[in-house]
Amino acid sequence: MKQYLDLCQRLIDEGTWVENSRTGKRCLTVINADLVYHVDKNEFPLITTRKSFYKAAIAELLGYIRGYDNAADFRAIGCNTWNANANDNQAWLDNPHRKGIDDMGRVYGVQGRAWSKPDGGCIDQLRKIVDDLSKGIDDRGEILSFYNPGEFHMGCLRPCMHTHNFSLVGDTLHLTSFQRSCDVPLGLNFNQVQVFTLLALMAQITGHKPGTAFHKIVNAHIYEDQLELMQEVQLKREPFTSPKLVINPNIKSLEDLETWVSIDDFEVTGYEHHEAISYPFSV
């Protein structure tokens, strides 16, 4: 929790004002932010200086694991984050690759489970990683990437958190996740929950101990209309101890994650928090 608040303070103290052409707003921006999550100690990085929610973040992660390309599928498992991108983005609505209502195109999990090969067919990146790690293999290329510039025009949104690199040392699994851009007051809580949970799940289904998750953010920013709430409310609150994440121990394989697992198989315990803060969201 301290590292999150330190990053927020760093944005205020060291950030440079940058005009964002997409939103028409200014952002205080810093380049390169490194966060570390101790999955081995089960220190779940759910923000405590405001009431935060984890279920939609984990549901979205499940959708990525399953390779979903439709907002309706995400809604069915408890995640509404793709509704607007799939249905209210005019550029995507006009795109000839859009298949209809709720279609997201070739984004995130589609790339992770069915990356197109130039000679035909596709690569299931996640399946390869799970198979290797289950056999105790780390070829120094256990990389799950959603970032495919050759198919950006075939999807509604470029990935923000785009690459997950797994490393097996002895019987302990580690993860390094890369993110190109992050709205710190709103988006980071969502993202860090996913990084933590992804490592915990992958360790569980491949039979290894979870280690450390390293989260690398390139462009970390706070929008001008979020600044006052961050300075005058959230940063003046004392954080509570991190809660714990409890995952159903019956989840034992990638096939389990693809089929019967739901958000009800995840529980957060010991979560103390301050009141919610309604930060403005920039579309």
UniProtKB/Swiss-Prot annotation:
Its EC number is 2.1.1.45. The active site is at C160 (nucleophile). GO terms for molecular function: thymidylate synthase activity. It comes from the Bacteria. Pathway: Pyrimidine metabolism; dTTP biosynthesis. The keyword Oxidoreductase does not apply. Keywords: Cytoplasm, Methyltransferase, Nucleotide biosynthesis, Transferase. It catalyses: dUMP + (6R)-5,10-methylene-5,6,7,8-tetrahydrofolate = 7,8-dihydrofolate + dTMP. Pfam families: Thymidylat_synt (PF00303). GO terms for biological process: dTMP biosynthetic process; dTTP biosynthetic process; methylation. (6R)-5,10-methylene-5,6,7,8-tetrahydrofolate binds at D183, S282. It is found in: Cytoplasm. It is an enzyme of class 2 (transferase). Transmembrane segments: none annotated. The keyword Kinase does not apply. DUMP binds at R22, R180, S181, C182, D183, N191, H221, I222, Y223. SUPFAM superfamilies: Thymidylate synthase/dCMP hydroxymethylase. GO terms for cellular component: cytosol. Belongs to the thymidylate synthase family. Bacterial-type ThyA subfamily. Catalyzes the reductive methylation of 2'-deoxyuridine-5'-monophosphate (dUMP) to 2'-deoxythymidine-5'-monophosphate (dTMP) while utilizing 5,10-methylenetetrahydrofolate (mTHF) as the methyl donor and reductant in the reaction, yielding dihydrofolate (DHF) as a by-product. This enzymatic reaction provides an intracellular de novo source of dTMP, an essential precursor for DNA biosynthesis. Homodimer. HAMAP family: Thymidy_synth_bact (MF_00008). This is Thymidylate synthase. The lineage of its organism: Bacteria, Pseudomonadati, Pseudomonadota, Gammaproteobacteria, Alteromonadales. The gene is thyA.
